Every structure is written in C-alpha cells, then in structure tokens.
Amino acid sequence: MMSYEGNGDGVAISTENHNENYISLESSPFHEDSKSRESHDLKKDSSKISEKDNENGRDKDGNKDRDREKDRDREKSRDRDREKSRDRDRDRERSKDRQRDRHHRDRHRDRSRERSEKRDDLDDDHHRRSRDRDRRRSRDRDREVRHRRRSRSRSRSRSERRSRSEHRHKSEHRSRSRSRSRSKSKRRSGFDMAPPDMLAATAVAAAGQVPSVPTTATIPGMFSNMFPMVPGQQLGALPVLPVQAMTQQATRHARRVYVGGLPPTANEQSVSTFFSQVMSAIGGNTAGPGDAVVNVYINHEKKFAFVEMRSVEEASNAMALDGIILEGVPVKVRRPTDYNPSLAATLGPSQPNPNLNLGAVGLSSGSTGGLEGPDRIFVGGLPYYFTEVQIRELLESFGPLRGFNLVKDRETGNSKGYAFCVYQDPSVTDIACAALNGIKMGDKTLTVRRAIQGAIQPKPEQEEVLLYAQQQIALQRLMFQPGGTPTKIVCLTQVVTADDLRDDEEYAEIMEDMRQEGGKFGNLVNVVIPRPNPDHDPTPGVGKVFLEYADVDGSSKARSGMNGRKFGGNQVVAVYYPEDKYAQGDYED
C-alpha cells in the first residue's frame, strides 16, 4: 500500500493501520475459529430450523393427509348416506308401484267381479224372464185349449141348428163372437172367465139386488125346493138365481148329455126321436108335454153324440138311461166335459128322479146314472145335514164324477146317510177310498170302499197322489163342520205352487190377480199369500191364498163364486178359514 507523510499523512497512516489492524483481527485464527463455530452453529440452527420446518411441513402434510382422509371418509359417509337415501327412495317408489299395481289389480278384479255379477244378474234376469214367459205361455196355452174345446163344442151344436133356422144361426154367431172376446180378455188375469151365470150372480150381488126364489115352479127345469135350508147346516151364501140362467145359452152346459158308442146307422133324427120317446116312457118329461130333446149333434167318425134337453131336470133324468139299447147296441150316457156340477146345482137337480119308471124301457131301477160296475164306490156314515152339493164337492176333490146318487127317503126326501158314486177315471177309485175312509165328519165317521168287495189296494206310484188328496180332504172338512158359521176369511187352495211364488214379478202378478178377482165379491180388506223361505225351510201356508173381507157377506159370495174356478189351469178350492188362526198368522191346516 502507498504511505503518506506529514499530519495528514499521519492520519492516513493511522487509518490504514486501523484497517490493517482490523484486517488483522479478522484474519486471526481465533477469529476464524469463532466464526467457524458460529457458522457451524448457524448451520446447526438452520439445520434444526430446517428440520423443524421439515417436521412442521411433515406434520402439516400429515395433517393434510389426515384431513384429506377425513374428508374422504366424510365423503364416503355422505355417499353411503346418499346411496341409502336413494335406496330408500327406490324402495318407496317400488312400494308405491306395488301398491299401485295391487290397487290396479284389485280394481281390475273388482271390475271383473262386477262385470261377472252383472252378467250373472243379466243371465238370471234373462232366465227368469224366459221362465216367466214360458209359464205365461203355458197358462195361455192351457186357456186356449179350454177355449178351443168349448168353442168346438159350441160350434158343433151351432152347425146342426144352422140348417133349421138362419135367424138362429145369426144369433149363435153373435154369441160366438161375444165368447171369443171374453176369451181374449180373460188372458189379462190368471183366473179363467167366470161362466155367464156366475158373472150375473156377481153383478146382482154387487148391486144388492137379490131376487126372491119363487115358491112355485114357473120356469122349466126349476122347482120350489131347489134351495132347501136345513138347520145347523153350513151352506155359505144362498145361491142366487141369475137372470141369464133363465136363458137357453146360460143353461146349455147343464142341459146336454153325452151319448157314446152309437151304432153306425144312427143319425141326428133317429137319436132325437129315440130319446124323446124313451124320456116320455119313463116319465122323465118334467118340463111339460112335447119332445124332451131340442137338438142333437153327432160325430159319425168317433160315434158319439151330444143330446140337448129342454131343461136341466130332464137332462139329469136322462142320466138314468146309461146302458140303454139303441138299435141293438148298448150306449153310454154321461155328462159332457164342460159340465160344472157346482153351477148346475143352482139351476136344477143334478141327479135322476128316483121315481122314474126305468122298467118300461128294460132298465133296472138300480142303474142310476152309470153307477153299476166294479168301480162303483159306497160312501157311508154321512151326516144327515150334508147336502148333495157338499158331498159332491168332497168327492170331486179327486176328480170328476161319472155318476153320483145320494140315497134319500122316498116319503120325506131326507138323506139316509149313504151314497154311491163312480169316477170318470177308474184309476182314482182306490185313491179316493183310501183317503176318505175313516175321516171324521162331525159326529160321524165315513166308510168309503168299493161297492163290490175285494178292492185293489193303491199302487206304490199312487202314494204321492194319496197324500195330496188327504191334505185336500183336511181343507174340505173346514167347510163341513156342523153348526159352524162362515167367517170373514176365505182360503183358496190348489191355486199356486212354491215355484210361482219365488219370483218377485210373478208374485206381484198373482197378488194383483187375487186383489182384482177377490174385490168383485165385496169389500176386500187384505190378501195374504205366504211365500217360501229363501233357505228352503218349510213355510206354513205355501200354496194357499187368504182373502180377508170386511164382512161375512163378502166372504160368502167369494167362497161361492171362486170355488171350482180355474187359475193358471188349476181348479180352485175355496173354503172358510178360522178368523182367530188367521189373526195369529197361523196358516197351517
């Protein structure tokens, strides 16, 4: 280094020396060693700091890793929660879908069931309507058959009279037209049209005009004692003599007789002459002088004839001619199929006069009305107060009679308590005997058997018919109680069946028919028709119809007017019913 002189130089030297000294200090070994230590310490500290920093960094990194791990765990937990939530949502949706499907299936099942039930109801309704239509058609066919049978019978008589008088032909034509119109109108009700005399009786009774019965015979075929009243007897309403019964048309059914088994050579004129002469010979012309026969119709193919007499009494006398010989051939004399014994009893006697001189024509006095033969029935033990009409009603519960004879005292005319009868259908004979024999009638017990001993017992297939007949006899006994009086209740039997009453529409129609028909005879208070139980348990009174009237006068007219009528092809039996049993709802016999 450059050296300076003087003071100034001295300063300069001093400064330089100071720097040298300073440099000397710095460059001294101690100083270097200290510096080295410091540096080492600094490095150590720096290393520690660095290590701490590293440790802190590592801690921070660890914390961050832990935080990240926690975050991942939390995220996973949230993911699991979200997944569970989504699963729950999916389960809820599936449950809702299942519920919707179940509801849809249930609703579909309900609709299917409703449709099936509707179809079943429609099928049932169709079947019921079809059954009702079939039942109504059957009733209409039955009525039409009866109408055609009556029309054929009337037309046969008219065809024969047509040749005699054109005027009478026109009259018959008008009568036939009226009859056809009546036949059509009757289809509106289950009841048949009442015969003309019954309609007139109803009309007269409804108007309160009961004509008096004449005390002397003023009309052919009628006589003063045709309505005897015996004390203690139950007759119901007194038979009324209608105006129409005085005409030929109204009494024709009771004035005709059937003659079967005619010889091939017989004709209308020969038959008419023969029976007129025979009636005169036996004393059967009770209507006065002249021919008893007014008309004859012959069916040559079937060899039978219908012979029409002047009066009801003469027709009954002609019934005693059964078996008479006509041109060498024995002929059968019977009542025609349209003969109504209940109505005929109000027009005149229904049995031959017991004083006829049958021996004058070669017949025995015992051959009254076809009562001979193996099927003749003896009916004994009859109460003396029983009338002929009552006994016939009892016997005809089993079928129409071919002949009947109530034996009476010749002097007094009173019943001797026994009778004979023959049924048109011989198969009914044993059934009637078995059902009637032993029945109590008042203070008497009936004895009913074949008049010829050795009667055949009922066949097994007849047992059901026998049971039914016994039930009907029990009903008939209600009418024949001695000293009894008519009640306000009329019971109709043999009217309807249990099947008819199960259908509501059919039941309503039957109820309406009964109200309309029953109301014609008086003040009808109520109609009771017991119906069968749906569970098929026995129901008392099923098959019967009970008519309640305000007074006995109405019930008496109804009983007389409806007994023997036809309803739906069945013949009605009308009897009085005890008022106390009816009030208690007891409809059993």
From Swiss-Prot:
It is found in: Nucleus; Nucleus speckle. Component of the spliceosome. Interacts with SF1 in the nucleus. Residues 1-195 are annotated as: Disordered. Residues 255-338, 375-453, 494-580 form the RRM domain. PANTHER family: RNA-BINDING PROTEIN (PTHR23139). One of its GO terms (biological process) is mRNA splicing, via spliceosome. N-terminal RS domain has a very strong bias in favor of D over S. Residues 14-27 have a biased composition (Polar residues). This is Splicing factor U2af large subunit B. InterPro entries: Nucleotide-bd_a/b_plait_sf (IPR012677), RBD_domain_sf (IPR035979), RRM_dom (IPR000504), U2AF_lg (IPR006529). The gene is U2AF65B. Keywords: mRNA processing, mRNA splicing, Nucleus, Repeat, RNA-binding, Spliceosome. It comes from Arabidopsis thaliana. GO terms for cellular component: nuclear speck; nucleus; spliceosomal complex.
